[in-house]
Amino acid sequence: MGLRVSALDGRDPVVDLGEGLEIVLVEAETDSELDLDHIALLSADPAAAEVQWQALGFAPDAKGRLEIGGAWLELRQGDPDDHDRPLLNHIGVLVDSVEEHQAEAEELGVEIDRVVDAPNTLALFVWGPDRVKLEYVEHKPSFSLS
């Protein structure tokens, strides 16, 4: 996983969290001190997974990555099941309308895991390539960070 930071200030850009998980600090312009830059996922067939992620709303770029909401998804060749325990539960993206994404998922035959209607958010969880769960989350008018 990569986090965008406004300045490295001499810090090592790679933080080893153990168990094969690293956070890479990417120095770039950002609206806050820390922001999501990218997520890298293993896939047995990255080309096929890329097509499936595009159907879920991710857009390809010239560098071979997929973009959504200003962050990047990198697909790397490898066995997605080659871990003792999962380190990623799901990828969440903020959307204007969960209902639109649900209708599109149903039309495309995407497997829906569940819909969660919480007091301040509405969320749709679908199964993406290599059984990675994707959450589309919509903030209701009552949503507030304070």
Predicted feature locations:
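Short alpha-helical
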Residues: 47-48, 99-100, 121
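A structural feature that tracks compact, well-ordered secondary-structure segments
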Residues: 92-94, 103
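Short, surface-exposed ligand-recognition loops at beta-strand->loop->(often short) alpha-helix junctions
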Residues: 40-47, 94-95
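Alpha-helical polar/charged "hotspots" used for coordination or helix-helix interfaces
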Residues: 38, 90, 97
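Amphipathic alpha-helical segments
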Residues: 44-60, 105
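Vicinal oxygen chelate
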Residues: 2-38, 61-80, 102-146
